Curated annotation (Swiss-Prot):
Gene this chain is encoded by: yitT
Keywords: Cell membrane, Membrane, Transmembrane, Transmembrane helix
Alphabetical list of Pfam families matching this protein: DUF2179, YitT_membrane
Family of the protein in this entry: Belongs to the UPF0750 family.
Protein name, as recorded: UPF0750 membrane protein YitT
Lineage, broadest ranks: Bacteria, Bacillati, Bacillota, Bacilli, Bacillales
């Protein structure tokens, strides 16, 4: 348990460092915006810098924006998930204060692509190990509890506002480069983790009862079991079908590996659910 928590903490630190590096060394110096709350923080920092007699850094604004979201997550999502998410935001803010805002390239396209890739690697790793970078991920969790509709619309609306505002503030060329960054970020996160809110896991195993008990001890999810037989070995097994959110994927993978390392698990995207799906 201590080893797992230490590993998770280390991943959160590395993810925050990569996210901060992508912002300070590539995106912010080039006036190219990230997605989600980070992009909102960049926009607010630009507006304050242009129209106010004082300056507030992107990192500070990112932390302030996540305070109400963190409180919401604590009440509606779960304490462990929220603590790691806020820790990720705090570390990102810290690293953004330490790393200099200096451009490694004068080519805006290179900044947009590499900034998006480096930040996305940090975000993807954080998600893969059961945490998040706060902001929209916590909002998405809350929305997923209220309704089973895809939350991609909310991501699209907020990122669309970021692109339009970037165009008004910095010119439409910068807005197009921001669009490149958003595309690259999404593709890299997809490659490392997944952007799908709900997933279906099909687990073929000889230890269905043990896995079932372990799953029920960690999460509240319904499981359907179907008799299965290996075509080559003719061995009798069971296939367990369970629908989870993407934030539970890390816990599920960990359970299956611990109980039955020889189990075969297939994870597929779930586009819709009809019937009861527990949201608590």
């Amino acid at each position: 348990m201590v080893l797992d928590q230490t590993k998770k903490l280390l991943i959160v630190i590395i993810g925050a460092l990569l996210n901060a590096a992508g912002l300070n060394l590539f995106l912010i110096p080039a006036d190219v915006y990230a997605s989600g709350f980070t992009g909102v923080a960049q926009l607010l920092s630009s507006v304050v810098d242009q129209y106010a007699p004082f300056y507030i850094s992107t990192g500070t604004l990112l932390f302030l924006l996540n305070i109400p979201v963190g409180i919401l997550g604590w009440l509606k999502v779960g304490k462990s998930f929220t603590v790691y998410s806020i820790l990720s935001v705090a570390l990102t803010t810290l690293f953004m204060g330490i790393l200099p805002e200096t451009s490694l390239s004068h080519d805006i396209l290179l900044n947009a692509v590499f900034g998006g890739v480096i930040s996305a690697v940090g975000i993807g790793l954080t998600l893969k190990y059961g945490a998040s970078t706060g902001g929209l991920d916590i909002v998405a969790m809350v929305l997923a509890k209220w309704k089973d509709k895809p939350v991609g619309t909310y991501f699209f609306i907020l990122n669309g506002i970021i692109i339009l505002t970037a165009g008004l503030l910095q010119g439409w060329e910068k807005a197009l480069y921001t669009l490149v960054t958003l595309y690259v970020t999404t593709r890299v996160i997809d490659a490392i983790h997944t952007r799908h809110m709900k997933l279906t896991a099909m687990i073929v195993t000889k230890k269905a009862d043990e896995i079932k008990e372990a799953i029920y001890g960690k999460m509240v999810r319904g499981i359907t079991t179907v008799p299965a037989k290996g075509a080559f070995t003719n061995e009798q097994k069971e296939m367990m079908i369970i629908v989870i959110t993407r934030y539970e994927l890390y816990d599920l993978e960990k359970i299956v590996k611990e109980v039955d390392p020889k189990a075969f698990t297939n994870i597929v995207q779930t586009t819709g659910i009809f019937g009861f799906f527990r949201k608590d």
